[in-house]
Amino acid sequence: MFSTKALLLAGLISTALAGPWANICAGKSSNEIRTCDRHGCGQYSAQRSQRPHQGVDILCSAGSTVYAPFTGMIVGQEKPYQNKNAINNGVRISGRGFCVKMFYIKPIKYKGPIKKGEKLGTLLPLQKVYPGIQSHVHIENCDSSDPTAYL
């Protein structure tokens, strides 16, 4: 009886720690956060030149398929920059109590339903704009809170 309860509890804890979102990038077994490089660090609130980082950077190879983290609606395009550089693209997704902005992807669509784990788009070539940076998807909650626990 005790071992059954222990196994059940261990399963619940590992599920909770894994977060409710799907893996973001094809070819990755988990949502690994970008470490530090000369362009900064990928964790939430990492200091940037003028402000703290408002999202989390998930490692992903350029050209890789990017997946929806949860079931919801793609509600529009998001652009992280004021210019028209090669990586200035992304989407906003809302649903299941979540709202996120995902940057540096070429989405398959800018509006409409999407399911958790469904192809959302393709990672853009960050190296063209930031040589030496670790390629990644930027994901941030719409309310600027820390998304790390859901990853």
Curated annotation (Swiss-Prot):
Phylogenetic placement of the source organism: Eukaryota, Metazoa, Chordata, Craniata, Vertebrata
Keyword Disulfide bond: yes
Function: Has a neutrophil chemotactic activity. Also a positive regulator of chondrocyte proliferation. Does not show metalloendopeptidase activity.
Location of the protein in the cell: Cytoplasm; Secreted
Tissue expression notes: Highly expressed in adult and fetal liver and weakly in testis. Not expressed in bone marrow.
Protein name as catalogued: Leukocyte cell-derived chemotaxin-2
Predominant cellular place of this UniProt entry's protein: cytoplasm
Residues that hold Zn(2+) according to the record: H53, D57, H138
Molecular function in Gene Ontology: identical protein binding; metal ion binding
Taxonomic source organism: Homo sapiens
Induction of synthesis: By phytohemagglutinin (PHA).
PANTHER family: LEUKOCYTE CELL-DERIVED CHEMOTAXIN 2, LEUKOCYTE CELL-DERIVED CHEMOTAXIN-2
Family statement: Belongs to the LECT2/MIM-1 family.
Gene3D superfamilies tied to this protein: Glucose Permease (Domain IIA)
